A protein has these predicted regions:
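Short alpha-helical transmembrane segments in multi-pass integral membrane proteins
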Residues: 1-25, 82-154, 201-256, 312-377, ...
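Interfacial/gating helices of multi-pass transporter permease domains
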Residues: 23, 46-65, 136-141, 205-206, ...
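Transmembrane helical elements of multi-pass membrane transporters/channels
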Residues: 23-42, 148, 182, 215-219, ...
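Hydrophobic/aromatic residues within transmembrane alpha-helices of membrane transport systems
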Residues: 30, 42-46, 57, 82, ...
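Helix-terminus/linker motif at the lipid-water interface of multi-pass membrane proteins
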Residues: 33, 37-55, 124-136, 192-203, ...
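Small-residue-rich hydrophobic transmembrane alpha-helices
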Residues: 54-114, 156-175, 286-344, 348, ...
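Hydrophobic transmembrane alpha-helices of multi-pass small-molecule transporters
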Residues: 66-69, 186-191, 220-224, 296-299, ...
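Short runs within selected transmembrane alpha-helices of multi-pass transporters and secretion channels
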Residues: 75, 149-167, 175-183, 208-221, ...
């Protein structure tokens, strides 16, 4: 591979930008839509067990978010370094980046598996008031679910890294296959393992977790296969996974801010659960349902985001200013359009969305208000997400971190806390649009600085 120094330029530097962005993003958007559908269907089946089971899965969300943050953030660092190295024709460095990414995921998996074994019950007990009559049931459900998800988390973590490698080299079609197959397997296995269909044992919430990890492991296996057989830009081998400090440092210069940025979401969900729990466990369940529903809107935008990062990074390495600007403009237009559709759906039929999860009258009362208020920030979020992906592609991980901290920690939790104590439960949801207005304003300021510092100077 390395002897091909005269190879044809990657399509990310030559294909028309609109066509390239659609080509790069559509497979990931489609696969993430399937992934979002799985998230929704999974929770629908869990809600049929009981509202306590649904609450338990909602309370597990912060740790699952943290796990995704570590895998996704490291993947962002690998993606940016790999794409930039390919754009600069530094093929040996690109190869090393891919192998270090795989090694880092193996190490991260061990840490989460250990927490799954020893820390799961304590994590749920920290969120549930022991005096509640259903506290033991929620903790039991949650511990069973989270232990399985973490002990077998090597599937999702390695899958995410391998998919980032495929994305960075323009092989996005294969990421659609891996994510799609994994999600479909999960959806098929959910009712079978939860309710004991087709001769399978009735596992309840443990069945939901088992279906999840089986789907993830199958997706990981496909991602390994595609990287070995279809990806000629990099070569994965255990012999090449000897730690390389400079490469790991380059990965985490972008990756650690991205990890922290996504982990902030974990802190936010944990904090919101603590703010909502004194009102009722139903309010916590509503918050969890909102995140499942919003994934169907946000996941396609994240798929678009994953397509944008390697395109901008590659063209930054190749010093192609106009292609970078076209990518950003077109990305924002698509993102805001998707978010507008999502906002309209949430405003029009919140009750029908909630009834998918077997919502009780109390859940409907709380949830209809929550969905209609929260969705008002969707279009603003669409702009912020694209700007954050731009910062990441330029290696400006700190800028992404600052924006994420503003929208998911610095503003939203204090706002939610104050609104809860002054105005009550229904006012809490206004913290989302308040935080988004602040973060988008700050994002615009940072982007103007980035433009004058890096983009404007390109040929």
């Amino acid at each position: 591979m390395e002897q091909m120094t005269e190879r044809k330029e990657n399509k990310m530097g030559t294909m028309p930008v609109k066509k390239l962005l659609i080509t790069m993003s559509l497979p990931m958007m489609a696969s993430m839509l399937v992934q979002a559908l799985y998230n929704i269907v999974d929770s629908i089946f869990v809600s049929r067990i009981s509202e306590d089971a649904l609450t338990a899965v909602s309370l597990a969300f912060p740790i699952q978010t943290l796990m995704i943050a570590v895998a996704g953030g490291t993947g962002v660092g690998v993606n940016a370094l790999l794409s930039r190295s390919l754009g600069e024709k530094k093929f040996k460095e690109a190869d090393r980046a891919a192998n270090m990414g795989f090694l880092l995921m193996l190490i991260s998996y061990v840490a989460f598996a250990v927490f799954g074994i020893f820390g799961s019950r304590m994590f749920f007990e920290s969120q549930v008031d022991a005096s509640l009559p259903n506290a033991k049931e929620i903790v039991s459900y949650g511990t069973s679910y989270l232990q399985i998800c973490l002990i077998f988390s090597f599937g999702i973590m390695l899958e995410m890294m391998l998919e980032r490698i495929l994305q960075a080299t323009g092989k996005t079609f294969f990421t659609m296959i891996t994510q799609g197959v994994g999600a479909v397997v999960n959806i098929i296995l959910d009712p079978i393992l939860i309710f004991g269909l087709c001769g399978a044992p009735r596992l309840g919430i443990a069945g939901a977790a088992t279906a999840t990890v089986v789907g993830q492991i199958i997706a990981m296996s496909l991602a390994v296969f595609f990287n070995i057989t279809k990806n000629t830009d990099v070569s994965l081998s255990f012999r090449k996974m000897k730690p390389h400090g400079a490469t790991i440092g380059s990965i985490y210069r972008v990756g650690i801010p991205s990890i922290i940025m996504q982990a902030i979401g974990s802190i936010m969900t944990y904090g919101m659960n603590k703010i909502l729990a004194p009102f009722s466990t139903t309010a916590v369940a509503v918050f969890g349902v909102y995140f499942k529903l919003n994934s169907f809107i946000f996941m396609p935008v994240f798929g678009l985001n994953n397509g944008i990062i390697p395109i901008i990074a590659y063209n930054y390495g190749a010093r192609k200013k106009e292609r970078i600007l076209q990518t950003i403009r077109f990305g924002i237009a698509i993102s805001v359009s998707i978010m507008f559709v999502g906002m309209c759906i949430f405003l029009a039929i919140p009750d029908k969305l909630l009834l998918l999860f077997d919502a009780s009258p109390e859940m409907l009362k709380i949830g209809k208000t929550a969905l209609r208020i929260i969705c008002t920030h969707f279009m603003l979020a669409g702009c912020s997400i694209i700007l954050m992906s731009t910062f990441q592609a330029f290696g400006e991980g700190i800028a992404s971190l600052m924006v994420s901290a503003l929208r998911q920690l610095i503003v939203i939790l204090p706002a939610a806390f104050i609104l809860a104590h002054v105005f009550g439960l229904n006012a809490i949801w206004w913290a989302f649009p308040i935080a988004e207005i602040c973060s988008l304003t700050f994002s615009a300021i940072l982007f103007k600085r980035l433009y004058h510092k890096k983009i404007k100077l390109l040929n």
